[in-house]
């Protein structure tokens, strides 16, 4: 399920990158799923 979650997160990040107008959302996603 980790792989599935990662794929979903990657898709979300890609979408945010396309319309990088909500850094807050990106910050929340990073906090919820720290890649570090």
UniProtKB/Swiss-Prot annotation:
Region span, Disordered: 17-36
Q: Keywords of this protein's UniProt record, alphabetized?
A: Hormone, Neuropeptide
Q: Which GO terms describe its molecular function?
A: hormone activity
Q: Which GO terms describe its biological process?
A: neuropeptide signaling pathway
Tell me the domain of life: Eukaryota
Q: What Pfam families does the record tag this protein with? A: Crust_neuro_H
Function noted in UniProt: Neuropeptide H is the precursor molecule for neuropeptides C, D, E, F and I, which arise by incomplete proteolysis of neuropeptide H.
Can you say what this protein is called?
A: Neuropeptide H
Species whose genome carries this gene = Cardisoma carnifex (Blue land crab)
> Which lineage ranks, top first, belong to the organism behind this chain?
Eukaryota, Metazoa, Ecdysozoa, Arthropoda, Crustacea
């Amino acid at each position: 399920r980790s792989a599935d979650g990662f794929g979903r997160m990657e898709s979300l990040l890609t979408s945010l990158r396309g319309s990088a107008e909500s850094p807050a959302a990106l910050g929340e996603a990073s906090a919820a799923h720290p890649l570090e």
